[in-house]
Amino acid sequence: MKIFIIKIILVLFNYVLLSYSINQDLNILNVYDVRFAQTHVIPIEGKSWILNNKTYTLTIVGNRDSLLLVKFIDISITGTSSIKTVTTKTTKEEIKATILTNTYNVMVWNNDIVMGTRLLNDPNQLPPTESNGEQYSNEHHSIMIPKEWVKPGMKLQFFENSNSFIKSSKFIFPNVGQDYTLKMWTLPFYLFGANDTNTRPFNQTKNIDDSISAGLSQVYSCSNILSLNHPIQRVDWPYLVLGPRNGLPGMLITNSDQKKDGYAIMEGVLNILTGIRVAFGESTSSIQIYAPLLHLGANGKYADTYGGLGGSSRGTGDYRYSDTFVHEQGHAMGLPHAGEAFASGSYPYVNGSLLGSEWGFDINHYEFLSITLSNTSKNYKGCEKKNVKDTQNRCVKQSVMQSGAGDRSSNYLFSMFSDFEMSIIQNYFKNSIYYDEQIGKYKKWNETIGSYYEYKPITKDYGFYRLDDGIPIERDIDVYTIVFTYSLVGPEPLSQIYPLLKSKGNLIRQFDPTNKTEMKLITPNTGSIPWYCFNSGCDYTIRVTYDDDSIKHILLQQGKRQYWKPMGDFKLNFNDPTSSDSFLLGVINVKAIKTIKKVELLETLMAWNGISKNSKLLTFKLF
């Protein structure tokens, strides 16, 4: 009898537990497929890839207006529904999962602070697709979330408003990452007599106009874009010295037709941009620099670049800020050619296409972007002969980094990158040093805690690469930028001091080879910065003479030594005119507190031992 009573009690207890569980479920609003649309429509947890044993992760960018998308499932005992139901069985009840189109709110939190509430739009109000294309979804509710709410620590809770009692979801935690501004300098190069009249006026080349910046902000994964003319403003030079390249010796050219191949001038300009970034203390920053090339051919008329070149935070090409520009700045942020990357196993989508990438979204047009070509695309006609196809035999877009420029719809300035490429761009910004102008301090991003922290620059690797993380010791001061070349084997025209560039710029730490205390710091193996001269030696010095005959010496972190042998043998090919070992390009900034009247390049072998007043003069220029 006791056993029977116990069994009855257990049955009743289990029934109560089940009923309680069901009722508890009924009070929970069930959500799924929650997504954020920025450059791409991605799950709130982000998206990851593992390629060649390396993990790539795309997250939601902080401080960027975003479209929130969500589907709802309502679980009810009654099973009432106006749309299809999915039925499951339990031992006691039949529960129907119903996809509804009720009215819903979302409350956005940041940690324990409520940022605000938004009423979600019904699925029939979802933004359209470019060129009236296939609808992205007919089930997602959506709403724009202001950028101020999109930050690490974000959490979402959804509420159903159609029942007699309020039903709420569990908290959902979007994976929000770094917020950052893509700051971009533009520095037009007017070469070989090019000017505002015979090419393009400076007011059209000095900066990216607002409409183009707005378009760029939708294809690059960033919080916003800040495009500014570089402090140097413009470069006007009648000649350009090209270093040895592709087995050919260096040369001085005075028109674009003298170049030996299509990329020679662009490579020369990129190398100068590298020096400018270093001289301005931006080598470890995420600041981009792009140089529109305006040069004349042998006929004295504008010669198009017909392409571009980019990498390592620099880019150059034509002045139009269009397809070439967006592609080269992709290289500048670390993106390779997508087709080549796929072949090497470092890009996930076949032949550099977008097959497998998430759809895109453009907030300016308020449209979704399909991964397939629209019928308004320039490349739509005949695409079946060259483009990758999806399962419905539709042409799939190519990445911007693999011949995809013409795949965009006709009313768009730029075509699409893949979602994977955005993860590379995000990683590029994570490792950079930022200057906070409001507080006058440097900061870096800490991904673990999801915030910036104050960063104090230090000299790493015993000064092998740079001092003080390459950061300026003085900012926003008047400077002269000195650009020079020197050939160890000649001819003489390859050794040049370019016309000076004056601007409001920055100054990095430098050493004076006439100062014994400073030279003691960089003496190989014994100084406190013992590897400063280990890359190629410290064998050259710039001597600047001002108009009052005062003199300044700046030791260059450049030499003619073999790698890791600052006191050892010269480079193996220093006498070969076709080798880069025989050529020197340098860029430094000096204070413009006085007018410069002469710049000299001196040979000062192993300068930490001190330099002679009669050091060998290699080249000079009077101003």
Curated annotation (Swiss-Prot):
GO terms for biological process: proteolysis. Its main location: secreted. Binds 1 zinc ion per subunit. Residues 174-435 form the Peptidase M66 domain. It is found in: Secreted. One of its GO terms (cellular component) is extracellular region. Its EC number is 3.4.24.-. Its cofactor is Zn(2+). InterPro entries: Dictomallein (IPR051256), MetalloPept_cat_dom_sf (IPR024079), Peptidase_M66_dom (IPR019503). The keyword Phosphoprotein does not apply. Zn(2+) binds at H327, H331, H337. This is Dictomallein-5. It is an enzyme of class 3 (hydrolase). Belongs to the dictomallein family. The active site is at E328. GO terms for molecular function: metal ion binding; metalloendopeptidase activity. It comes from Dictyostelium discoideum. It comes from the Eukaryota. Residues 1-21 form the signal peptide. Keywords: Hydrolase, Metal-binding, Metalloprotease, Protease, Secreted, Signal, Zinc. The keyword Cell wall biogenesis/degradation does not apply.
